[in-house]
């Protein structure tokens, strides 16, 4: 089957934003205007097409990223709608990894919010070009100029309006196009069926000012435009459009649009901007990977190149089983083909190829460069794996995910539940790289860990609904960590010799703090005092011991371990003996490495009316919070603080009480920090 849409006319985009900025509503309107759906569903009514999970429809939030394909002006647009809640940022991260462009939706009243900053940072890591849609222009307190100012102040980016609103709040009824220099006035009885009109006379002055600001910003990035501007030559709309596209593709400039998705205003103009300014797969840089010898391989995005793709999401479907979502970077693939998972070195067979629309699907026989699809039948492939045609060894850069910060114990209610629970949890962990399952070696309990209380609530709900597993859960616990703060050299010696073959393993290790870099192992053995075949056992012994901790049984992180000496026995040495010796050497750091307990610190932002600022600050301080800043925001004050996670359980109820239900808050993991002595002693005592 031949390709239906050229690469130039394909767009792979994501919709990203802070929670409640209107991402899913925006996506619904896009689908409506492109003819993909014929009846609009509302998120707050639980009728959204893109929020298809039961929990999403009940809670009115997006939990997973849903994929769909729409068509506009002879272009195919693959869209991924992502969650805004901080507990589900992994969905945003893995979507951005495979997208070429994004629409960032921000609230016209709130401007840039904490999760906007997080998703913006994630998009910047992957160098994703973006257009910005200032939504909810009909909302009380909407202020387009303020929203743009927050983009510059909080994100520090070159962002300029390419549109200007006609009115705001209830009077928002049109948009001025600063590129074409005309206006579009909406017919409020049937939005988006308005007409092009001259720019209102009372807005001519600000329109010219804003167009000049746009040109000034772009001229710092575009030499040709700068010459025209300095020489006061007329700048055509075509020239301005080309300059916007060029700067947007380089992610050095971000055009700002306005509208109200709920009222159906500005969405068609945004679709035009997606086609005009966001990149096609052939506009982005060639994909770079590495072969088995760690040599760089560059692949251009052409159908004629060998097939290479990245798996970015795995999910369990009740009808077809395991679905693997992937993005093709070069070449093409047919249903039924055999491919290599070059990350794991395994062979996989592609079953059915599916074009997804939220949770419905359309089968296709062949897929090409730039396509985002799902495939049935992959056995070993997980998130971040590279898939390539047979004979290739190229591996693309994978994805890094944050470690969980909160954990609970789950206990099956019956024997039947016990049998099902292990399988269900394994499937859920396969879908979500930030969800971890492990056993507490002391109590034998099954522990599940995630990014927040909502994250784990959803997991427990899915256990019950999708897998029919009934389970009891404990109160949430903080996922503390341990580390050492002092460099030390320790000896580990394991000798058992009592007739017959014994055990002999002997190592000298140097352990040193490795802040923010995780675990690192270095082999500095000279002269074979520890034979090469036992070195992996030493590394494994240390890694296993790290998981069990040295102070209170919490995982040890950020440690560099160097094997520099030791000895062996020709007959009695074994991998097991060296593993045990290595773990003994690590345990010695309890007395020599000045170990400490680390606690997760959360970045908390509370938005409260002025009347309650004192209450909120006093309460945060009592929770060991460190105030970072506070700023006025519309008719409220935004207070930002770093607070230990252990102090934040039940905070929503207290905040409601302290502010008569008028404040909101959001928190996300910021970093691990050394716990105070009193807290450390309390933790050790509790775990003893």
From Swiss-Prot:
Q: What is its main location?
A: cytoplasm
Residues annotated as binding GTP: 17-24, 81-85, 135-138
SMART domains, sorted? EFG_C, EFG_IV
- Read off the SUPFAM superfamilies from this record: EF-G C-terminal domain-like, P-loop containing nucleoside triphosphate hydrolases, Ribosomal protein S5 domain 2-like, Translation proteins
Q: Give one GO term, molecular function aspect.
A: translation elongation factor activity
What this protein is reported to do is described as: Catalyzes the GTP-dependent ribosomal translocation step during translation elongation. During this step, the ribosome changes from the pre-translocational (PRE) to the post-translocational (POST) state as the newly formed A-site-bound peptidyl-tRNA and P-site-bound deacylated tRNA move to the P and E sites, respectively. Catalyzes the coordinated movement of the two tRNA molecules, the mRNA and conformational changes in the ribosome.
Q: What is this protein called?
A: Elongation factor G
State the InterPro entries in the record: EF-G-like_DII, EFG_II, EFG_III, EFG_III/V, EFG_IV, EFG_V, EFG_V-like, G_TR_CS
What is the organism of origin for this protein? Onion yellows phytoplasma (strain OY-M)
Q: Can you cite an annotated GO cellular component?
A: cytoplasm
Enumerate the subcellular locations listed in this protein's record, separating them with semicolons. Cytoplasm
tr-type G domain residues are: 8-282
């Amino acid at each position: 089957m031949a390709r239906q849409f050229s690469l130039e006319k394909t767009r792979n985009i994501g919709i990203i934003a802070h929670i409640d900025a209107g991402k899913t509503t925006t996506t619904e309107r896009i689908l409506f205007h492109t003819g993909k759906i014929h009846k609009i569903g509302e998120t707050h009514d639980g009728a959204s097409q893109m929020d298809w999970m039961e929990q999403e429809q009940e809670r009115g939030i997006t939990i997973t990223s849903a994929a769909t394909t729409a068509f506009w002006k002879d272009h195919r647009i693959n869209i991924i709608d992502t969650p805004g809640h901080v507990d589900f940022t992994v969905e945003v991260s893995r979507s951005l990894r495979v997208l070429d462009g994004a629409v960032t939706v921000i609230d016209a009243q709130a401007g840039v919010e904490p999760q906007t900053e997080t998703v913006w940072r994630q998009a910047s890591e992957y160098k994703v070009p973006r257009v910005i849609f200032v939504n909810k222009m009909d909302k009380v307190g909407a202020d387009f100029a303020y929203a743009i100012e927050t983009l510059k102040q909080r994100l520090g980016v070159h962002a300029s309006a390419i549109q200007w609103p006609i009115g705001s709040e209830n009077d928002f009824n049109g948009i001025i196009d600063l590129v074409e220099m005309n206006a579009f006035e909406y017919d409020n009885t049937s939005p988006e069926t308005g007409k092009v009109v001259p720019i209102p006379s009372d807005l001519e002055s600000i329109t010219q000012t804003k167009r000049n600001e746009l040109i000034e910003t772009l001229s710092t990035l575009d030499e040709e435009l700068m010459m025209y501007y300095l020489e006061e030559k007329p700048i055509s709309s075509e020239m301005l459009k080309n300059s916007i596209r060029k700067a947007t593709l380089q992610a050095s400039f971000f055009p700002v649009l306005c509208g109200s998705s709920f009222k159906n205003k500005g969405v068609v103009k945004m679709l035009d901007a997606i086609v005009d300014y966001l990149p096609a797969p052939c506009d982005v840089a060639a994909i770079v990977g590495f072969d088995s010898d760690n040599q760089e391989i560059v692949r251009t995005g052409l159908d004629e190149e060998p097939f290479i793709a990245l798996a970015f999401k795995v999910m369990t479907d009740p009808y077809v089983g395991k679905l693997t979502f992937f993005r093709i970077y070069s070449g093409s693939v047919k249903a039924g083909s055999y491919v290599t998972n070059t990350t794991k070195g395994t062979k996989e067979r592609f079953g059915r190829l599916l074009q997804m629309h939220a949770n419905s699907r359309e089968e296709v026989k062949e897929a090409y460069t730039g396509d985002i699809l799902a495939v049935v039948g992959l056995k070993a492939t997980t998130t971040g794996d590279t898939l390539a045609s047979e004979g290739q060894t190229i591996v693309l850069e994978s994805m890094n995910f944050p470690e969980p910060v909160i954990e609970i114990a789950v206990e099956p209610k019956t024997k039947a539940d016990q049998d099902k629970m292990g399988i269900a949890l394994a499937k859920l962990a396969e879908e979500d790289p930030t969800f971890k399952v492990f056993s507490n070696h002391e109590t034998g309990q099954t522990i599940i860990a995630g990014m927040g209380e909502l994250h784990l609530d959803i997991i427990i709900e899915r256990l019950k609904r999708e897998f029919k597993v009934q389970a009891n859960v404990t109160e949430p616990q903080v996922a503390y960590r341990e580390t050492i703060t002092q460099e030390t050299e320790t000896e580990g010696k394991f000798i058992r010799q009592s007739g017959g073959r014994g055990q002999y393993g002997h190592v000298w290790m140097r352990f040193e703090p490795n802040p923010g870099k995780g675990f690192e192992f270095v082999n500095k053995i000279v002269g074979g005092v520890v034979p090469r075949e036992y070195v992996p056992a030493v590394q494994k012994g240390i890694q296993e011991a790290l998981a069990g901790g040295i102070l209170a049984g919490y995982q040890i992180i950020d440690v560099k371990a160097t094997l520099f000496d030791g000895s062996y026995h020709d007959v009695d040495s074994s991998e097991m003996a060296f593993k045990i010796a290595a773990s003994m050497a690590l345990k010695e750091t309890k007395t020599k490495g000045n170990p400490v307990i680390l606690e997760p610190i959360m970045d908390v932002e509370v938005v409260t009316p002025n009347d309650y600022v004192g209450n909120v600050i006093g309460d945060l301080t009592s929770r060991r919070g460190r105030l970072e800043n506070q700023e006025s925001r519309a008719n409220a004050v935004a207070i930002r603080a770093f607070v230990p996670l252990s102090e934040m359980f039940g905070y929503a109820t207290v905040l409601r009480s302290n502010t008569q239900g008028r404040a909101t808050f959001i928190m996300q993991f910021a970093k691990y920090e050394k716990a105070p002595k009193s807290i450390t002693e309390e933790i050790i005592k509790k775990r003893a």
